[in-house]
Amino acid sequence: TFGDWEYTVLDECYDLVDYMSLHQYYGNAADDTPDFLANSKGMDDFISGVVSICDAVRAKKHGKKRINLSFDEWNVWYHSNAADEKLEKWGQAPHQLEDIYNFEDALLVGSMLITLLRHADRVKMACLAQLVNVIAPIMTSDTGAWRQTIFYPYMYTSIFGRGTVLNTQVLAPVYDSRNYCDVSYLDSVCVWNE
């Protein structure tokens, strides 16, 4: 239904809508690193597709306002799937969705943050889903708290990703993966901040 639903809703509600909500999670159940890391290209295509739909409805209605995007939920999520299937139904405060992230996950989160910055002209809000314990960059236990690998790209983007995003043109070798073509080996974004 992707595309049809967004277009239909905007066609009916364009004058009442300021933001279109997006959600997306990525996993690596197939243990396919090249394809997993290429998911940032899938996120880029997803954003571009929704922007095109918003702009098509705007053109059809001769609208003046530009609908922006709110990427309400995004993250890497797959490590805990098998463990969560074994949980007792209706248990009290079960430990669930507690993914323990690796370096591949940090690379993809970093690339997804780059993708969000590159689309800052239209993606005005983006929320990493969740922040503590549940598919999260920070984990806690009775004995303390620790930062996972995905914490660091998020932290550095928060520090250095403030300002005006510049149009960056990068020429680098590309590869094809199981689901994506022409994936660049180099992903980058520049942010100017006085």
Spans of features found by a protein language model:
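Alpha-helical scaffolding within the catalytic cores
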Residues: 2-12, 111, 182-186
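Aromatic- and acid-rich polysaccharide-binding/catalytic face
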Residues: 6-44, 67-68, 72-77, 87-98, ...
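Aromatic/hydrophobic pocket-lining residues that form the small-molecule binding cavity
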Residues: 43-47, 109
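Active-site-proximal structural segments of metal-dependent nucleotidyl cyclase/transferase enzymes
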Residues: 50
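Carboxylate/His-rich catalytic cores and anion/metal-binding grooves
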Residues: 54
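Short helix-capping segments at alpha-helix termini
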Residues: 57-64, 121
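Aromatic/acidic polysaccharide-binding cleft in carbohydrate-active enzymes
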Residues: 66-191
